[in-house]
């Protein structure tokens, strides 16, 4: 336990791999600093950050997960235990969707002996129904635990209050923020339009190895920032470059090429983790496809990254000057294989001949405007009402299904809630119909639309 005279309090985030430590670190720091992924042992180093919690500056430490089979596990565990001893408070994070293991309990008790100033933080409790899962963690022997969901921003404010109380810091109220309303929005993206800071459009360039991503970055920025080579996998770390188009800043990130999992070895695995991090903070993805040869299955799998991260998307058909087939055949194949991206604009290009490069820049701005669009509530409800009248909602076991009203609660990407009497009865096919209707009425070029249904009673209670 830390007994030094310094005034800056230190908080260490500990726990097994892949339980959400880095995500919690990012949430508390209000930045995406630590790499977060599904790989065990993603965080290899200590991430240290001075942050402000309700007006108080503290030091936050995110440490590597301590699994027996993890890389450098003994060294990481020893370093973690030392961090626990030196910290003023420990946040021990567990996965609320998993059953606690004997190893996890043993590790927690070992840390608790070193420093009893310890909170048990049960992550991934995404809604009230999942709270009962937290009872399984009573075996840790903590009289009080904290149920949170980092991805849904639930329970974070209560945890922060408890942290400040444990550290002997008085809460400073900076603004009148309705925390309850913020936490009731069960979505990781709660972006509002009222940000006065200058927005930089973040664009991730994705694709298989050697399809021309680095060449595209070079011609877009007119710089030789990326090494261009015929050797697959030349780009390891994401390389970023900012340009100005129509007084709008655009930051391009050239990510490592993606190949089949069976071929991913050593540093390429690290590169993929960095690619995931780059996409997490991107607004738009440029999916680069090599048309000098037919599309492959991996192209389709990579395209799903844009959907996974809810990004705007533009399809770039590179090496058009040496395309393998006529225009009509390539476009027909593209439409068939990438049917779920039919809303994405398509641009043919040749980096060697700088074909359509300026068009790509202007299309990015157009897609970003759609990505940031907010539909006036009255207009949105008018369109939804007309759509449900034209094609009524299917009944639910013979009972009438109604949409009372719709509201757009977020942008980047646009997210819409339908307040209904029977939200579970909203079939995915009808949701797709509503999305297509909105696309026809409003220009959502290259932009994913997210629609969810909420029960009227729960909305009224909230």
Swiss-Prot record:
InterPro entries hit by this protein: G_ENGA (IPR031166), GTP-bd (IPR006073), GTPase_Der (IPR016484), KH_dom-like (IPR032859), KH_dom-like_a/b (IPR015946), P-loop_NTPase (IPR027417), Small_GTP-bd (IPR005225)
Pfam families: KH_dom-like, MMR_HSR1
Binding site for GTP 1: 15-22, 62-66, 123-126
UniProt superkingdom: Bacteria
GO molecular function: GTP binding; ribosome binding
Residue numbers binding GTP 2: 207-214, 254-258, 318-321
EngA-type G domain residues: 9-171, 201-372
Keyword Thylakoid belongs to the record: no
Domain (KH-like): residue spans on this chain: 373-457
GO annotation terms (biological process): ribosome biogenesis
Entry keywords, A to Z: GTP-binding, Nucleotide-binding, Repeat, Ribosome biogenesis
Keyword Nucleotide-binding listed: yes
Subunit structure: Associates with the 50S ribosomal subunit.
Family according to the record: Belongs to the TRAFAC class TrmE-Era-EngA-EngB-Septin-like GTPase superfamily. EngA (Der) GTPase family.
Function per UniProt: GTPase that plays an essential role in the late steps of ribosome biogenesis.
PANTHER family: GTPASE DER
Protein name: GTPase Der
